Swiss-Prot record:
GO terms for cellular component: cytoplasm; cytosol; membrane raft; plasma membrane. This is GRB2-associated-binding protein 2. Phosphorylated upon EGF stimulation. Phosphorylated on tyrosine residues by HCK upon IL6 signaling. Phosphorylated on tyrosine residue(s) by the thrombopoietin receptor (TPOR), stem cell factor receptor (SCFR), and T-cell and B-cell antigen receptors, gp130, IL-2R and IL-3R. Phosphorylated upon stimulation of TNFRSF11A/RANK by TNFSF11/RANKL. Dephosphorylated by PTPN11. It holds the Pfam family PH. PANTHER family: GRB2-ASSOCIATED-BINDING PROTEIN, GRB2-ASSOCIATED-BINDING PROTEIN 2.
Length: 665
């Protein structure tokens, strides 16, 4: 045991000490012999020393308790080997020391002794708040006796056995029940409120997890309810024909209202448009509406309402609708078209020609465009943007973007008189006789889910243009501009198709740089002990330690950084100003260090002349630091030669005078 009077030793014992906070993962918690010394009688500072073992003479470290700010007892630690241990900490201005006792009685003894020496009082606010959280987390298992007043010291916990919660609650420790503690919580505050609040929070988590695990029907029902509350046109997911709004039904649910005039698409042609989408167009109630068997798509559920008139989409018995080998329909795309308000009944469009009857052209190009007239109707087909390979299987179609559609007029419509090409400068979505195309262009926001196109019932010649930026492989052999196919993007999966926004951090062999930052934050939270409902904190009333240190009229000890044992070398590093000041610093002040380093710098400055100590250079080099040694490397040759000659002459004179002195003696 260390020297010193035995009267000042307050407490001794074995404790496990934590490494520094930044090294909790790399270094182990070491067992050390701690001695608590009180210096009130001798005038020395109050210190907590720890040694390598009981018989060590020199302490590994001396913790000055005058710098102690707070003491917390009953901390919770997630580390496996220390999960059920009794952890308390000592917070100083330099570092926070986490100490682990073997029993709860030992922890209470150390905490009580340290608090008595430092003059700490228990923090009332933190204790009450933590106990309220404890009652909320444990629910009916908590008793009213746990809401005790905070002036009880930690020694009252000796009578209660340590109990730890095995339930997956927020905290690991369960507050012990002390029968002699008096509850301070008023009877007017019902305890069931806290328990119900916890139940509500857990129910929210269950609902959140269920929203990710269930199918899209529940999600689409939520979207239908939102739409029904905002517009009042859709009720319980069934599309109703109210004031010209046609709503798409939910998946696997048929609309019996339009059963005779329903045009069912195959599964590969079904649009992803959910019940949240509504169609606007003419005011008549006898128009045919083609309902879709829509697949469930969880990624495009958050798109905005698509305002179109009706869903005139041709079908085919094939697995995918192919317009003469140029476009392939995606099963998850919305269909958009523009309707004439004056039309009363529209016959279903004829089936498209088979691929063998069509012309072959490049992938992603447009074959022909219908004429733009008042009596003509452009039939819209949902065509995904395909800029890569022409060989598309069903799995590729399912993975394709369901937030990006084209409006393409189908061929063979009964109302189309002829096929003609439009001018490249103005290519309409449906039909347009507008004179200026600049006024009709609407800027497109790829991340928005707003309404893209809406046909006014009273205007037959006005439509909306939406510019589109084509991909690198979008070819147009007939000279049509790329804006002929307006595109709308959703916020969910548009980035999978466009090649420019490539996230190169997703490559398998690429090391992501932000990963260590996240791990560092997680390790700090997981590795550090945290407060639990049974944690009690002690600190000074004014939370200042300078007044307490001046109260005892003792200087701050410089031994708090003193360490000579190699066992804790990782925490005893003292940064040096100069590499030549490696000599041990005596206890007291650091003033002798610059003097020694200055003398060493003089010899380093004259290192190019090792055998000649020049006394007249000392005043000039006394203020030179080690960082300015490079000035002596780049010297003038003439001055150097003159200096060497002078030194040689001085050496010769000294050698010639020595024999004469010897002769005189």
């Amino acid at each position: 045991m260390s020297g010193g009077g035995g009267d000042d030793v307050v407490c001794t014992g074995w404790l496990r000490k934590s490494p520094p906070e930044k090294k909790l993962r790399r270094y182990a918690w070491k067992k050390r012999w701690f001695i608590l010394r009180s210096g009130r009688m001798s005038g020395d500072p109050d210190v907590l020393e720890y040694y390598k073992n009981e018989h060590s003479k020199k302490p590994l470290r001396i913790i000055n308790l005058n710098l102690c700010e707070q003491v917390d007892a009953g901390l919770t630690f997630n580390k496996k080997e220390l999960q059920d241990s009794f952890v308390f900490d000592i917070k100083t201005s330099e570092r926070t020391f986490y100490l682990v006792a073997e029993t709860e009685a030992d922890m209470n003894k150390w905490v009580q002794s340290i608090c008595q020496i430092c003059g700490f009082n228990q923090a009332e606010e933190s204790t009450d708040s933590l106990r309220n959280l404890s009652s909320a987390s444990h629910g009916p298992r908590s008793s009213p006796a746990e809401f005790s007043s905070s002036q009880h010291l930690l020694r009252e916990r000796k009578s209660s056995a340590p109990s730890h919660s095995s339930q997956p609650t927020l905290f690991t420790f369960e507050p012990p029940v002390s029968s002699h503690m008096q509850p301070t919580l008023s009877t007017s505050a019902p305890q069931e409120y806290l328990y119900l609040h916890q139940c509500i929070s857990r129910r929210t988590e269950n609902a959140r997890s269920a929203s990710f695990s269930q199918g899209t029907r529940q999600k689409s029902d939520t979207a239908v309810q939102k739409l029904a509350q905002s517009n009042g046109h859709c009720i319980n997911g069934v599309g109703g024909q109210v004031h010209g709004f046609y709503s798409l039904p939910k998946p696997s649910r048929h609309n019996t209202e339009f059963k005779d005039s329903t045009y069912d698409l195959p599964r590969s042609l079904a649009s992803h448009g959910h019940t949240k989408s509504s169609l606007t167009g003419s005011e008549t109630d006898n128009e045919d509406v083609y309902t879709f068997k829509m697949p469930s798509n969880t990624l495009c559920r958050e798109l905005g309402d698509l305002l179109v008139d009706n869903m005139d989409v041709p079908t085919t018995p094939l697995s995918a609708y192919q317009i003469p080998r140029t476009f392939t329909l995606d099963k998850n795309h919305n269909a958009m078209t523009v309707a004439t308000p004056g039309d009363s009944a529209i016959a279903p469009p004829p089936r498209p020609p088979k691929p063998s009857q069509a012309e072959t052209s490049q992938w992603g190009s447009i074959q022909q465009r219908p004429p733009i007239s008042e009596n003509s109707r452009s039939v819209a087909a949902t065509i995904p943007r395909r800029n890569t390979l022409p060989a598309m299987d069903n799995s590729r179609l399912h993975r394709a973007s369901s937030c990006e559609t084209y409006e393409y007029p189908a061929r063979g419509s009964g109302e189309s008189a002829s096929w003609s090409a439009e001018p490249p400068g103005k290519t309409a979505v449906g039909r347009s006789n507008s004179a200026s195309s600049d006024d009709n262009y609407v800027p497109m926001n790829p991340g928005s889910s707003t309404l893209l196109a809406m046909e006014r019932p009273g205007d037959n010649s006005q439509s909306v243009y939406i510019p589109m930026s084509p991909g690198p492989h979008h070819f147009d052999p007939l000279g049509y501009p790329s804006t002929a196919l307006p595109i709308h993007r959703g916020p969910s999966r548009g980035s999978e198709i466009q090649p420019p926004p490539v996230n190169r951090n997703l490559k398998p062999d690429r090391k992501a740089k932000p990963t260590p930052l996240d791990l560092r934050n997680n390790t700090v939270i997981d590795e550090l002990p945290f407060k639990s409902p049974v944690t009690k904190s002690w600190s000074r009333i004014n939370h200042t330690f300078n007044s307490s240190s001046s109260q005892y009229c003792r200087p701050i000890s410089t031994q708090s950084i003193t360490s000579t044992d190699s066992g804790d070398s990782e925490e005893n590093y003292v940064p040096m100003q100069n590499p030549v000041s490696a000599s041990p610093v005596p206890s007291g002040t650091n003033s002798p260090a610059p003097k020694k380093s200055t003398g060493s710098v003089d010899y380093l400055a004259l290192d190019f002349q090792p055998g000649s100590p020049s006394p007249h250079r000392k005043p000039s080099t006394s203020s030179v630091t080690s960082d300015e040694k490079v000035d002596y490397v780049q010297v003038d040759k003439e001055k150097t030669q003159a200096l060497q000659n002078t030194m040689q002459e001085w050496t010769d004179v000294r050698q010639s005078s020595e024999p004469s002195k010897g002769a005189k003696l």
